[in-house]
Amino acid sequence: MLSPKRTRFRKQHRGRMKGISYRGNRICFGRYALQALEPAWITSRQIEAGRRAMARYARRGGKIWVRIFPDKPVTVRPAETRMGSGKGSPEYWVSVVKPGRILYEIGGISETVARAAISIAASKMPIRTQFVIAG
């Protein structure tokens, strides 16, 4: 699973997801892509599940680029813990995704195979997405 090697601070504020994505919303590497249509936190497990599903379907033919990286730690308090005594410990990492963000790119395969591979990856995502073709 993806996670930063080291961070400046162990814990972060939750923040809020307003507006659309102005960065990372164009296809850069491949020919076909999966684009987010809703804002969400996508966990490193979900990113890896989508990548594996695409890789398994496309086999050796295509190349896959993962365009998001989970750089935000999410803290969770232990079960049945009383309020107070500080913030919980970091449990997992998420990537903050806004509408318009490209999640995955794929190239080197036909459009029908790319559509099928990306639809499998899209089913692993917790948000609505769309298939995009470069150009």
From Swiss-Prot:
<dbReference type="GO" id="GO:0019843">
    <property type="term" value="F:rRNA binding"/>
</dbReference>
<dbReference type="InterPro" id="IPR036920">
    <property type="entry name" value="Ribosomal_uL16_sf"/>
</dbReference>
<dbReference type="GO" id="GO:0009507">
    <property type="term" value="C:chloroplast"/>
</dbReference>
<dbReference type="GO" id="GO:0005762">
    <property type="term" value="C:mitochondrial large ribosomal subunit"/>
</dbReference>
<dbReference type="InterPro" id="IPR020798">
    <property type="entry name" value="Ribosomal_uL16_CS"/>
</dbReference>
<keyword id="KW-0934">Plastid</keyword>
<dbReference type="InterPro" id="IPR047873">
    <property type="entry name" value="Ribosomal_uL16"/>
</dbReference>
<dbReference type="GO" id="GO:0032543">
    <property type="term" value="P:mitochondrial translation"/>
</dbReference>
<keyword id="KW-0150">Chloroplast</keyword>
<dbReference type="Pfam" id="PF00252">
    <property type="entry name" value="Ribosomal_L16"/>
</dbReference>
<dbReference type="InterPro" id="IPR000114">
    <property type="entry name" value="Ribosomal_uL16_bact-type"/>
</dbReference>
<keyword id="KW-0687">Ribonucleoprotein</keyword>
<comment type="subunit">
    <text>Part of the 50S ribosomal subunit.</text>
</comment>
<dbReference type="GO" id="GO:0003735">
    <property type="term" value="F:structural constituent of ribosome"/>
</dbReference>
<protein>
    <recommendedName>
        <fullName>Large ribosomal subunit protein uL16c</fullName>
    </recommendedName>
</protein>
<comment type="similarity">
    <text>Belongs to the universal ribosomal protein uL16 family.</text>
</comment>
<keyword id="KW-0689">Ribosomal protein</keyword>
<dbReference type="InterPro" id="IPR016180">
    <property type="entry name" value="Ribosomal_uL16_dom"/>
</dbReference>
